[in-house]
Amino acid sequence: MARNKKQLPLLEKVTITDVAAEGKAIARVNDMVVFVPFVAPGDVIDIQLTRKKHSYAEGKAVFFHEYSPRRAEPFCEHFGVCGGCKWQHLPYEEQIRYKHKQVIDNLTRIGKIEMEEILPIKGSKHTTFYRNKLEFTFSNKKWLTEEEVKTGAKFDCMDAVGFHIPGMFDKVLDIHKCWLQNDISNRIRLAVKEYCLTHEGYPFFDLRNQEGFVRTLMIRTASTGDLMVVLVFFYEDVERREALLSYVAEQFPEITSLMYVINEKCNDTITDQDVLVFRGKDHIIEEMEGLQFKVGPKSFYQTNSEQAYELYKVAREFAGLTGNEMVYDLYTGTGTIANFVSRQAKKVIGIEYVPEAIEDAKVNSSLNKIENTLFYAGDMKDILTQDFINQHGRPDVIITDPPRAGMHDDVINTILFAEPERIVYVSCNPAAQARDLSLLSVKYAVKKVQPVDMFPHTHHVENVVLLEKLKVKN
């Protein structure tokens, strides 16, 4: 017999005091920290606990007694249900203030860093429609909101096109309007959905039972006006696939790259799948400071193009290049930073784990007639070794932009062996960055810190740190 779960208590008239990691807010009740999403400091609420541990608890707001004066009206109808844009209820100036504080807290608390200078965070000029890439999922298991459940109505159609509900791999929230990407994205998504619902033979995918035809939709935009659409199907049905793709091409002639994938795997990733061109090119072109970057369906490119430019300008400025330096660009991806700084460097060597990304990096150098870059593919800790440095020359500057987990200890040790004059550390996770900075502190001092907001209305923040080699005392 299953045991009944113990009902957790309701906490009444609790004041929210601060913002925490992962975008949640904090309340303190009897020396216990309570994490609550979708509330703002200054809100007075009733909290229904959903999880309780020894020193902390998690809960959700079930009633608002007072709304904080530091609260904004969310602009999206999906706020509070969708997993994105969780900070819409905070004014943007508050968002970037908390992100700035998050960077300081991580560097001082985790990294024990003494900072000479931390610059004001670079906010985003645009706080909506700033993404250049979105992926939507087709599902026959639509997530019903609390309001829909309360109506008691029966829904004949449970098909949805949108985003996965956090923690529910097979449930999808049906998105009416998303504020993250140019409105062409909304129009394409809704048109594809309507076509599939009104034409026979286009069942939405059932991820749990591995059934259905239409799986996912990717839309990529570029500042050049290029537009890529990729539709993913579970199996090949030439007649229906071509009918849908022809409809999309006819309705949206501005699409410059219309592609498709037949993905018969269990999961939705297409990194190991063939992406086939139905109409147009196999890529789009993005531009930055006169440079062109080829972006394919599998390419990594920063999803906020405007702020990516600001981020890379900071990295280049911190690098202090005069034209005589050997630069190593670690975790180079498609070589965006490497190519961006190449005109101010003598030579740039880029290293990246993904072979396809390195091929894109080489293409981007060729596209821009850049001849002073070299790119290598492989696991960073296996490529970047003392032998590699002895063979290719010691770098004057290392720029590193690792994944969220930060750098492997072997990579850090090799950097310490290389002893570049300057290290520019770009990070999407200031906590992991702080840990790495602590390890580098045996030979390097933090000189500048520049947070950059790439993702308005989320808790995520990018951070660029300049480290300089410590002078040896005689």
Task: Show the residue positions of the predicted features.
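Short, aliphatic-rich beta-strand segments
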Residues: I219, G225-F234, Q292-G296
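Internal alpha/beta scaffold segment
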Residues: D170-F213, Y235-M259
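Short edge beta-strands and adjacent turn/loop segments
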Residues: Q210-T224
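Short, acidic/hydrophobic/Gly-rich beta-strand patch recurrent on exposed beta strands
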Residues: A25-N30, V161-I165, V232, A361
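Extended interfacial segments that mediate partner engagement and assembly in macromolecular machines
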Residues: F63-E73, G80-P203
